């Protein structure tokens, strides 16, 4: 699959946010929102440890912050670029927010190999496959760089 310069930049921003999360003491994940028109709108890191909120995964933080700062309508039809494959909770949150496309770097297996457990084995595409309206899910964009970030490199 080939990606545009904006898509590559969006994933790079998500990986940079993952590095920032690690430096802050959080699990190294980040996410970027790109509008339906192709504009990069927002970037968010994981904030589970720093907030004490087990739901503060990067994708959920992204949805919350965009809703609060830009309005929920900016989420509809947009794409999320995630440094790691979104979990079931994040996949559901993105669906309910109206996200139409999810692109991730490191797969669930990559994450398990790099970080260990706990593991919720439901993969993003499996969670979203029966969704109506459909949500497109793609993986592997900048995978090696994201895996290196997960491993602390």
Name each region found by the language model.
Residues 50-60:
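A short, polar/charged loop-to-alpha-helix boundary motif
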Residues 1-21, 86, 93-153:
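Zinc-dependent deaminase
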Residues 24-28:
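Short, flexible loop/turn motifs enriched in small residues
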Residues 14, 30, 62:
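Conserved hydrophobic/aromatic pocket- or pore-lining residues that grip, position, or stack substrates
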Residues 72-85:
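Immediate flanking context of iron-sulfur cluster ligation sites
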Residues 29-38:
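Short beta-strand scaffold segments in enzyme catalytic cores
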